[in-house]
Design a protein with these regions (language model features):
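Conserved short beta-strand elements that form part of the metal-binding/catalytic scaffold
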Residues: 2-6, 51-89, 136, 140-147, ...
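Core segments of cupin and vicinal oxygen chelate
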Residues: 12-16, 22-25, 29-71, 112, ...
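Solvent-exposed, charged amphipathic helical/linker segments at domain boundaries
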Residues: 146-168
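Short glycine-enriched loop/turn motifs at secondary-structure junctions
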Residues: 24-26, 89-92, 125, 157-160, ...
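Vicinal oxygen chelate
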Residues: 36-39, 67-72, 96-136, 170-171, ...
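Short, structured motif recognition centered on aromatic/hydrophobic residues
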Residues: 28-32, 45, 51, 91-100, ...
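Actinobacteria-biased recognition of intrinsically disordered, low-complexity terminal regions
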Residues: 1-23, 284-286
Length: 286
């Protein structure tokens, strides 16, 4: 595993409501966490990050909104008994959504570019329209057209989403995201992985305006582990990992020091993986 390929926080700094999104097309917009055990998941993330969970009631299938210090992080959905298009059980996992201007048009564009539609465009009451696709590399990605809900809120405090990245064996995925999401992919130069091989990184937007990254992970990770990853900020790596273990989670890789924070890949008790980033423990580039 290498360090993340981007800045310490995504570019979007927004409010959560409004008739028109303040996010640019292709920037990170929303997160969904799928689980088969809501109570255990709430206990785990509440203990690790101090998150609050708001049950939306029977009309929304008891989905939850996730908040950190009152600021929106994303949504929680119980997928027990649900299956995907191939009939397989839906796994517990974190899903990333990118902001778009027209869910129908962008989904059609994605199909033309080789994507498969997993969930066709649909309205989520007045909050917005969403769709879920599988890009040509096999990675799932959500599309969010904002209505009254703009997206998650970046606060810069521990518990906030701080970075998103697509880990892939197919670096040519960049062409898909440029065509479908108007991504402005900027090379970060070639780094080195732990084996001493070159690693190719890009970010959507340059420098501090970057909203997510794309990393060539061939030779770093098995192909079946590829996909989108989300990073959450923590104040202390040591304290966060102690909470992860105590509450039934596991450490998958790291910690790894980087200029963007101390990064550790972990999994919750349902084996949904994510990364924690202690931005205050960042190392100096040299």
């Amino acid at each position: 595993m290498g360090a993340p390929a981007g800045p310490a926080a995504p570019a979007a700094r927004t409010t959560t409501t409004g008739a028109t999104t303040t996010r640019s097309t292709g920037t990170s917009a929303w997160l969904d966490l799928s689980t088969t055990d809501t109570a255990r998941t709430v206990q785990f993330y509440g203990g690790v990050f101090g998150w609050q969970f708001e049950d939306l009631g029977e009309g929304f299938g008891h989905d939850h909104l996730i908040r950190s210090g009152g600021a929106l992080v994303g949504g929680l959905m119980n997928v027990a008994g649900m299956t995907g298009p191939a009939g397989d059980a839906l796994p517990p996992e974190w899903g990333v959504y990118l902001s778009i201007d027209d869910a129908d048009a962008r989904t059609a564009r994605a199909q033309e570019a080789g994507a498969a539609v997993i969930v066709p465009p649909d309205a989520i009451s007045e909050t917005g329209r969403m769709a879920i696709i599988q890009d040509p590399t096999g990675a799932g990605i959500g599309l969010w057209q904002a209505g009254t809900l703009d997206g998650y809120e970046f606060t810069g405090r521990p518990g906030s989403p701080v970075w998103f990245e697509l880990m892939t064996h197919r670096y040519d995925a960049a062409a898909f995201y440029t065509a479908v999401f108007d991504a402005e992919l900027v090379p970060m130069g070639e780094g080195m992985d732990e084996g001493g091989d070159d690693v190719r990184d890009t970010t959507n937007g340059p420098g501090e305006s970057a909203s997510w990254g794309l990393r060539d992970a061939a030779g770093m990770m098995p192909e079946d582990a590829m996909g989108w990853r989300v990073h959450f900020g923590v104040e202390s790596t040591e304290q966060a990992l102690a909470s992860v273990r105590e509450l039934g989670g596991s450490v998958l890789d790291g910690p790894v020091d980087s200029p963007f924070g101390r990064i550790t890949t972990v999994a919750d008790p349902e084996v949904a993986s994510f990364r924690i980033s202690a931005m205050g423990e960042a190392t100096t580039e040299g």
